[in-house]
UniProtKB/Swiss-Prot annotation:
Its main location: cytoplasm. This is Acetyl-CoA acetyltransferase. It holds the Pfam family Thiolase_C. Acetyl-CoA acetyltransferase; part of the first module of ergosterol biosynthesis pathway that includes the early steps of the pathway, conserved across all eukaryotes, and which results in the formation of mevalonate from acetyl-coenzyme A (acetyl-CoA). In this module, the acetyl-CoA acetyltransferase ERG10 catalyzes the formation of acetoacetyl-CoA. The hydroxymethylglutaryl-CoA synthase ERG13 then condenses acetyl-CoA with acetoacetyl-CoA to form HMG-CoA. It is found in: Cytoplasm. One of its GO terms (molecular function) is acetyl-CoA C-acetyltransferase activity. GO terms for biological process: ergosterol biosynthetic process; fatty acid beta-oxidation. The keyword Transport does not apply. It comes from Saccharomyces pastorianus (strain ATCC 76670 / Carlsberg bottom yeast no.2 / CBS 1503 / CLIB 180 / NBRC 10610 / NRRL Y-1525) (Saaz-type lager yeast). The gene is ERG10.
């Protein structure tokens, strides 16, 4: 039983900087905030009974408690009957959640699905492996959970940035090109904030005041304001000291945030008289050598277009690539021979931030905002993930 899959609501939290404005919130709390924001936009759906499933990405799950997706659902007010699945496909987790949700509806297993993701990189713990068996004698080691499970290649133990350097060498992408890309990403995101382009997608997060201080609301992405052009250009390379090109400034930062998307079947769309925002036209995934994860999106995008029945990539109005590093945006634009003016027009993860388990949904939320506000119809989102993979989704604005 194949049927169309519609997006009827999207929402995301602002993206907080590492140990920044959202540091007091767990990933589950951020996920629930995003989901509540999405639910508020579709009052026709009864949160307690109309939802069949939630599929939510989360990468750094240590110390969150069992089944983060289930926690998000119940915290946001969904019924106890809801089936919940947490996805860990590293950076592509939330996009995989969207794909799985669409497949569930297409197969007739569900009619209303929440897809998205959440991450608090700030609150990811350190690990002490020796504590389980007893450290016995002398010093022991603390392992950074963010680095171990989020930012290091599991196969060679190298930082993902080392492979970003490999990509720059392999594809002849210079430090100047990466710095220019990063500056442009910041400038586009700053301009988009100024013009209110993100207002419809962001749901404010309330931060409880302490010691008699009033509660505050976080309403904007925190990172874009941190641009200092001269500091960015003079930043030292991190992963390759001599003749390196990748810096902390032209890579995405470490962040906190969440995003949620509500998917429905055509039957529920008509039955509940819902207004469709977009249709999920297709998706595609690919993988190759783990060290080449940076350009895996260029393999996933053609698969997604084929699945969506789109033969000419030039007919796509806008693209959203997750900017894990500036080189990721540059290399995939280069390989696919895209018009750069169609790519990440509101800025990307270098400037907005990259909360790992959230980003795959965040790029789709922002892509839909772009299509709605810039007059486009067809959009493609893609995101690479550790291990050499990538996921891509094609949407059509309605």
């Amino acid at each position: 039983m194949s049927q169309n899959v519609y997006i009827v609501s999207t929402a995301r939290t602002p993206i907080g900087s590492f140990q920044g404005s959202l540091s007091s919130k767990t990933a589950v709390e951020l996920g629930a905030a995003a989901l509540k924001g999405a639910l508020a936009k579709v009052p026709e759906l009864d949160a307690s009974k109309d939802f069949d499933e939630i599929i939510f990405g989360n990468v750094l799950s240590a110390n969150l408690g069992q089944a983060p997706a289930r926690q998000v659902a119940l915290t946001a007010g969904l019924g106890n009957h809801i089936v919940a699945t947490t996805v860990n496909k590293v950076c592509a987790s939330a996009m995989k959640a969207i794909i799985l949700g669409a497949q569930s509806i297409k197969c007739g297993n569900a009619d209303v699905v929440v897809a998205g993701g959440c991450e608090s990189m700030t609150n990811a713990p350190y690990y002490m492996p020796a504590a389980r068996g007893g450290a016995k004698f002398g010093q022991t080691v603390l392992i950074d959970g963010v680095e171990r499970d989020g930012l290091n290649d599991a196969y060679d133990g190298l930082a993902m940035g080392v492979h970003a350097e490999k990509c720059a060498r392999d594809w002849d992408i210079t430090r100047d090109q990466q710095d220019s890309f990063a500056i442009e990403s910041y400038q586009k995101s700053q301009q988009s904030q100024k013009e209110g382009k993100f207002d419809n997608e962001i749901v404010p997060v309330t931060i409880k005041g302490f010691r008699g201080k009033p509660d505050t609301q976080v309403t904007n992405d925190e990172e874009p304001a941190r641009l200092h052009v001269e500091k960015l250009k003079s930043a030292r390379t991190v992963f390759q000291r001599e003749n390196g090109t990748v810096t902390a400034a032209n890579a995405s930062p470490i962040n906190d945030g969440a995003a949620a998307i509500i998917l429905v079947s055509e039957r529920v769309l008509k039955e509940k008289n819902l207004k469709p925002l977009a249709i999920v036209k297709g998706w595609g995934e690919a993988a190759h050598l783990p060290a080449d994860f940076t350009w895996a999106p260029s393999l996933a995008v053609p698969k997604a277009l084929k699945h969506a029945g789109i033969e000419d990539i030039n007919s796509v109005d806008y693209f959203e690539f997750n900017e894990a590093f500036s080189v990721v945006g540059l290399v995939n634009t280069k390989i696919l021979k895209l018009d750069p003016s169609k790519v990440n027009v509101y800025g990307g993860a270098v400037a907005l931030g990259h909360p790992l388990g959230c980003s795959g949904a965040r790029v789709v939320v922002t892509l839909l905002s772009i299509l709605q506000q810039e007059g486009g119809k067809i959009g493609v989102a893609a995101i690479c993930n550790g291990g050499g993979g990538a996921s891509s989704v094609v949407i059509e604005k309605l």
